């Protein structure tokens, strides 16, 4: 195709032809640097993948760029390389690594990372920035160093500043540009020991100025001027490489006054007594922590003689051990002798056993003296100097005194808090509370903290824990409610009153005598007794019910007013609650749902509340919340719950407390809906009764707080009602669930209508008929909300949101609506046969009518970003609505416009389809990384060109370009991993749509190159083979994904077209077209049945009939 058509589409804007006419698009023989190579890497989006056009450096030349940081080239350096045939680079058989990977655009690798010291990296010398103060050194003056010295030790003289970069030659290469410095020979990697004593210069070791005096020459000058006679002494050294070889370098004994330093024997003291005194003085001056570290150190001891006269006597030796570079031990600072060694060298002194025992006794004596002094000081403070107390009595007296002082402090703090509240209620200024630090924080570091022996007594003196308070309050409320139910059901007072009346009537009734027969006419006693009995029973029953009503009112008031704790916003417990709640919300935002639920439960315990235990407690708790909601519906419960508790807790404080508690219950209920219980056991299943209790608690407390400045915003109250509606749909039976779920949803709708539009725009999709139909299936809703489901792979269709129930419902609703659009576009539901996620059910598959405009607008509404910032005006610290914001979904919006445009094209509504072109062109970055998205986009561009740019001479060129790109993307997508379930059905539907657009575009562009006056089989044009090849590939792939069903007339029409483009017999093609046309007419008349997905493509059938008009005789 490249030989026939010139130009290409830019990958930085691949869908440019959607909003631009083809005549206005310039050819693209050379793409912009921001675009990709369309022939090789066009499927990889993003301009950052473009390779760097800079030419890499020559890796086989000596690393002059590495030595010369300024990048200068000097003739003398090249001359030095050419003249020294014995140079190390001359014998090098490999190229040194190029550390400047950034091409000069950033810091080099050698400047930012440490070298390992192995391989070719150990032969390269680090750069140096400070000039040396000596004379001009020779080029081959090389001294091997250890790896730690090469990387850390600065090469400097006492007269120069410190340098951060050191080379192993000790020469500043920046200032000596007239000499080429050679690295060490690559056959030797074993550094030799140094004979000079290392000096500390600004915290670093300098190995280059050891033999140089204040005014003397440098070491290298001495080495090359007058080397004295010497003898070789070999000493073991730690090796860097595994295979060491001999090094061809100057000997280390050439310098004068060389001494071996690897094993140092100290000079013996004048007498053993002096040595012992010095050791004891050293141990006494050491701190206890240093002594402990000294005792725990492990080292080997070596023996040596201390002179010819005392050869058999043991003496202390000092052994130098070199530690590894990366060993970071905090005890390396202190040696056994109290001296600090440098460069990881530790001096270990081994003393005789008698001396060590003496040191231990001194340390123990020091401890005992310190303890006795402190106990004596305590006794003087408590009882005076004359008192006689033992150590235990003194400590016991001190503990009792401390407890008494703490108790007094608690009482004083309580009084101060009450006075502060009184001043606050009277609106008088009051001082801020003083924060006192603990004694342990003010104590010195050296003193070891005493164990908290009075912790148990302090806990007994304090009040009970919030969890116990909440459990006790909850059980008391359940008990009161149980008593209320018992009074209403059994009426024990009425039974007692009835039994008393019956016994009284029985006592007053006359006793019939067996000897008396007959009756007395007009006896007044029976009538009067009966009248008095009825009058007495009515009066007595009224008394009983008045008493029952009074008891009910008492219980209700007790439960509503005194049963709900009101929080004090100035207390310490409230500050603890706020801190724990913020931590829980942070865990929730990070995705740690279980830990967030545990912290929310801790917040509930801090507010003196608790969740009911499974069983009878849950049943009575849910029953009481139902009764309370009935009272709230009658406005009796709201009026009683908002009453002022005390002077310090007015109505505003009560409403704010109820609002905060309602939001807390709502947040716990949100996680409970997703299957998070807050327990450590994963096998614990969430209870439906517990969910009902939390939802009803949130609703009742929200109604008690009210939708006011001191209460909750209407958007938050609407979301609380929505969660209660979802819980009723999940927990209640099928007969009761629709009624109660609809009841709470209507109350939420009422708050949404009264709230400002900008604050509730993120909740409007809940009340759409399609959403209500989606949420009517309890099993599907439970599966969507469950956290134990597998991670759904939605591909590039929607953004996956899993942090709240509404977010999960919104995500799956997007997939549900996209599947409805794909069903409408493809014309069948066979692609959704495998339904694993339960997003589609049987009723959804039977629905063939889809309101495209309604579904498209709903999808765009759901996918639009909306962040509602809701804050309580009077309480700035109590912020609501931070979890109700909604992020935008650009991918879902893009797919919605693409599918809607395809449906409009299928219905011949081209004007409505043009309204989506500009929105489709603004492709999200995630679509550019998805092969299916790119394929559909290019196929849509090709179809748009054939529909709207038919008169342009570039139609064939750009149709071939876009179809080729689309087929390449579809080929890559078929080999990549795909999703399953309903998402897989959406992918298959969009693939079919892309192949159909490709074949329609190719047929339309092929026909535009023909003359209508001649038969098509007698004509040929440039690029005809390109159309037939591309169409053949598209048809083959479409046949594979469509299956081998015999009743698919659509596939048969595509096969006829493919044969026609490849030069088949026109007579056979025409006979097949006549057969398809007759079958379609029979389906229209109702003689045969034909599925929507099997109906022939109208454009293909019409084009085939037009091309074979001359044969229709």
Swiss-Prot record:
InterPro entries, per database record: bHLH_dom, HLH_DNA-bd_sf
Name the coiled-coil region(s).
395-422
Q: Where is this region: Transcriptional activation (acidic)?
A: 1-52
Bias (Basic residues) occurs at 229-238
Tell me the GO molecular function terms.
DNA-binding transcription factor activity; DNA-binding transcription factor activity, RNA polymerase II-specific; protein dimerization activity; RNA polymerase II cis-regulatory region sequence-specific DNA binding
Role this protein plays:
Transcription factor involved in maintaining normal fat levels. Regulates the expression of genes involved in lipid metabolism in response to nutrient availability, such as the fatty-acid desaturases fat-5, fat-6 and fat-7. In response to a high-glucose diet, promotes fatty acid synthesis, elongation and desaturation, acting in concert with transcription factor mxl-3. Plays a role in synthesis of monomethyl branched-chain fatty acids (mmBCFAs) as well as other very-long-chain fatty acids.
| UniProt protein name | Sterol regulatory element binding protein sbp-1
Q: Where is this region: Helix-loop-helix motif?
A: 369-405
Q: Specify whether Transcription regulation is a keyword of the entry.
A: yes
Q: Which residues cross the membrane?
A: 478-498, 541-561
SMART domains found in the cross-reference section: HLH
Q: Which gene encodes it?
A: sbp-1
Q: Per the database record, which ranges form the bHLH domain?
A: 355-405
According to the record, the residues making up region (Disordered) are 24-68, 101-132, 206-274, 290-345, 437-472
Query: Phenotype upon knockout?
Result: RNAi-mediated knockdown causes early larval arrest and a pale, skinny appearance; paleness due to absence of dark, lipid-laden fat granules from the intestine. Decrease in body size, delayed growth, fewer eggs laid and 5-6 days after being laid, many eggs hatch inside the body. Exposure to oleic or linoleic acid returns body size almost to normal and also increases number of eggs laid. In normoxic conditions, reduces total fat levels, but has no effect in anoxia. Reduces the increase in body width/length ratio caused by anoxia.
Q: Which GO terms describe its cellular component?
A: endoplasmic reticulum membrane; nucleus
Which tissues express it? Broadly expressed, including many cells in the head. Expressed in the intestine.
Where, subcellularly, is it found? Nucleus
State what induces this protein: Expression increased by oxygen deprivation. Expression increased by glucose or fructose supplementation. Expression increased by simulated microgravity.
Going by the UniProt record, its keywords in alphabetical order are: Coiled coil, DNA-binding, Endoplasmic reticulum, Membrane, Nucleus, Transcription, Transcription regulation, Transmembrane, Transmembrane helix, Ubl conjugation
> Which residues lie within the region annotated Basic motif?
355-368
Any one GO BP annotation for this protein: locomotion
Acidic residues compositional bias, start-end: 324-337
């Amino acid at each position: 195709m490249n030989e026939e058509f010139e130009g290409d589409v830019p990958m930085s804007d691949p869908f440019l032809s959607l909003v631009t006419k083809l005549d206005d698009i310039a050819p693209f023989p050379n793409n912009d640097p921001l675009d990709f190579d369309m022939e090789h890497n066009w499927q990889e989006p993003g301009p950052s993948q473009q390779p760097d056009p800079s030419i890499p450096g020559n890796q086989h030349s000596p690393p002059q760029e590495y030595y010369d940081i300024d990048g200068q080239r000097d003739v003398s350096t090249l001359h030095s390389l050419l003249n020294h045939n014995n140079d190390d680079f001359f014998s090098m058989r490999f190229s040194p690594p190029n550390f400047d990977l950034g091409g000069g655009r950033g810091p080099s690798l050698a400047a930012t990372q440490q070298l390992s010291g192995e391989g070719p990296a150990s032969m390269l010398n680090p750069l140096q920035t400070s000039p040396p103060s000596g004379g001009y050194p020779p080029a081959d003056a090389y001294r091997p160093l250890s790896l730690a010295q090469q990387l850390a030790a600065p090469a400097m003289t006492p007269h120069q500043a410190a340098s951060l970069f050191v080379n192993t030659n000790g020469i500043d290469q920046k200032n000596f540009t007239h000499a080429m410095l050679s690295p060490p020979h690559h056959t030797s990697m074993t550094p030799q020991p140094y004979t000079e004593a290392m000096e500390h210069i600004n915290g670093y070791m300098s190995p280059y100025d050891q033999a140089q005096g204040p005014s003397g020459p440098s070491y290298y000058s001495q080495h090359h001027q007058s080397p004295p006679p010497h003898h070789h002494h070999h000493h073991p050294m730690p090796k860097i490489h595994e295979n060491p070889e001999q090094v061809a370098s100057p000997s280390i004994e050439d310098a004068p006054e060389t001494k071996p330093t690897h094993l140092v024997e100290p000079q013996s003291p004048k007498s053993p007594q002096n040595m012992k005194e010095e050791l004891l003085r050293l141990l006494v001056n050491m701190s206890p922590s240093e002594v402990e570290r000294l005792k725990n150190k492990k080292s080997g001891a070596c023996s040596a003689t201390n002179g010819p006269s005392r050869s058999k006597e043991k003496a202390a030796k000092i052994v130098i051990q070199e530690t590894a570079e990366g060993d970071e031990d905090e005890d390396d600072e202190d040696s056994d002798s109290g001296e600090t060694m440098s460069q990881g060298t530790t001096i270990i002194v081994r003393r005789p056993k008698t001396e060590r025992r003496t040191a231990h006794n001194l340390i123990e004596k020091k401890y005992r003296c310190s303890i006795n002094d402190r106990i004596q000081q305590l006794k003087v403070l408590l009882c005076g100097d004359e008192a006689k107390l033992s150590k235990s009595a003194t400590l016991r007296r001190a503990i009792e005194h401390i407890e008494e002082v703490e108790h007094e402090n608690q009482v004083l703090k309580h009084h101060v808090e009450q006075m502060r509240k009184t001043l606050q209620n009277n609106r008088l200024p009051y001082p801020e509370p003083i924060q006192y630090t603990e004694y342990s924080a003010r104590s010195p570091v050296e003193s070891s903290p005493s164990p908290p022996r009075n912790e148990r007594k302090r806990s007994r003196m304090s009040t009970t824990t919030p969890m116990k308070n909440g459990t006790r309050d909850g059980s008391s409320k359940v008990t009161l409610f149980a008593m209320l139910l018992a009074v209403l059901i059994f009426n024990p007072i009425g039974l007692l009153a009835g039994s008393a009346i019956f016994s009284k009537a029985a006592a007053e009734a006359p006793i019939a005598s067996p000897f008396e027969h007959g009756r007395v006419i007009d006896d007044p006693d029976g009538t009067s007794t009966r009248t008095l009995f009825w009058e007495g029973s009515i009066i007595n029953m009224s008394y009983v019910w008045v008493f029952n009503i009074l008891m009910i009112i008492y219980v209700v008031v007790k439960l509503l007013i005194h049963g709900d704790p009101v929080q004090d916003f100035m207390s310490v417990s409230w500050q603890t609650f706020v801190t724990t709640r913020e931590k829980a919300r942070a865990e929730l935002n990070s995705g740690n749902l279980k830990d967030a639920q545990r912290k929310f439960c801790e917040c509930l315990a801090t507010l003196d509340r608790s969740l009911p235990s499974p069983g009878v407690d849950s049943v009575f708790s849910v029953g009481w919340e139902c009764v309370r909601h009935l009272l709230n519906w009658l406005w009796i419960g709201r009026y009683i719950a908002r009453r002022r508790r005390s002077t310090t807790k007015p109505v505003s404080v009560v409403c704010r407390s109820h609002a905060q508690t309602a939001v807390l219950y709502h947040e716990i209920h949100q996680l409970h809906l997703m299957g998070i219980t807050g327990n450590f056991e994963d096998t614990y299943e969430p209870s439906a009764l517990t969910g009902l209790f939390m939802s009803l608690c949130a609703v009742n407390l929200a109604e008690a707080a009210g939708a006011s400045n001191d209460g909750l915003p209407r958007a938050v109250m609407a979301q609380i009602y929505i969660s209660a509606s979802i819980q009723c749909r999940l927990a209640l039976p099928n007969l009761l669930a629709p009624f109660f779920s609809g009841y709470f949803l209507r109350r939420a709708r009422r708050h949404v209508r009264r709230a400002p539009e900008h604050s509730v725009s993120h909740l409007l999709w809940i009340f759409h008929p399609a959403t209500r139909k989606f949420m009517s299936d309890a099993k599907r809703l439970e599966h969507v909300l469950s956290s134990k489901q597998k991670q759904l792979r939605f591909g590039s269709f929607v953004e996956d949101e899993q942090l709240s129930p509404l977010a999960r419902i919104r995500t799956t609703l997007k997939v549900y609506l996209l599947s409805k659009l794909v069903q409408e576009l493809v014309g069948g539901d066979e692609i959704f046969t495998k339904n694993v996620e339960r997003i589609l059910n049987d009723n959804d598959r039977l629905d063939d009518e889809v309101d495209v405009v309604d579904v498209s607008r709903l999808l765009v509404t759901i996918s639009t970003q909306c962040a509602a910032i809701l804050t309580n005006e009077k309480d700035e610290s109590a912020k609501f609505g931070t979890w109700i914001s909604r992020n935008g979904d650009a991918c879902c919006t893009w797919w919605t416009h693409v599918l809607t445009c395809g449906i409009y094209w299928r219905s011949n509504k081209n004007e409505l389809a043009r309204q989506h072109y500009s929105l489709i062109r603004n492709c999200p970055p995630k679509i550019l990384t998805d092969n299916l998205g790119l394929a559909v986009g290019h196929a849509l561009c090709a179809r748009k060109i054939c529909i709207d740019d038919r008169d342009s001479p570039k139609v064939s060129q750009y149709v071939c370009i876009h179809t080729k790109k689309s087929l390449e993307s579809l080929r890559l997508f078929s080999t990549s991993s795909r999703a399953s379930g309903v998402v897989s059905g959406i992918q298959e539907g969009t693939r079919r749509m892309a192949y159909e657009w490709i074949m329609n575009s190719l047929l339309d562009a092929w026909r535009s190159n023909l003359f209508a006056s001649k038969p098509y089989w007698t004509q040929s044009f440039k690029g005809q083979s390109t159309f037939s090849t591309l169409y053949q590939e598209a048809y083959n792939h479409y046949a594979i994904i469509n299956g081998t069903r015999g009743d698919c007339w659509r596939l048969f029409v595509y096969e006829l077209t493919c044969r026609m483009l490849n030069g088949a017999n026109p007579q056979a093609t025409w006979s097949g077209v006549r057969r398809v046309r007759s079958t379609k007419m029979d389906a229209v008349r109702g003689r045969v049945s034909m599925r929507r997905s099997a109906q022939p493509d109208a454009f293909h059938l019409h084009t085939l009939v037009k091309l074979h008009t001359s044969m229709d005789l």
